[in-house]
């Protein structure tokens, strides 16, 4: 099992949910109003550094990961340069 963490711009959460749903992933958690700084700049939800992010994470069988990564790469092609979407994959040792 692998944990897939997606971080993207606020306003794209429905697109990210749809992306994982198309790959039969129906269990996820979502954090909204996330602030931070990365390659696309600061997103602090202020007038000086506008914008916020959304974080969606899910646990998937390792066998589904390649298809999800390919779909994410295709999704990223349609984004504006300032709309960075990142994905992180972590091993899941155990689910309780």
Where are each of the predicted segments found?
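Positively charged, small/polar-rich N-terminal and surface patches that mediate targeting and assembly
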Residues: 1-96
């Amino acid at each position: 099992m692998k944990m897939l963490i997606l971080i993207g711009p606020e306003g794209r959460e429905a697109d990210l949910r749809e992306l994982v749903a198309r790959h039969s992933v129906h269990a996820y958690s979502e954090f909204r109003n996330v602030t931070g700084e990365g390659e696309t700049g600061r997103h602090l939800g202020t007038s000086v550094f506008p914008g916020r992010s959304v974080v969606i994470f899910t646990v998937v069988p390792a066998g589904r990961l390649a298809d999800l990564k390919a779909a994410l790469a295709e999704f990223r092609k349609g984004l504006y340069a300032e709309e960075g979407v990142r994905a992180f994959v972590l091993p899941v040792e155990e689910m309780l």
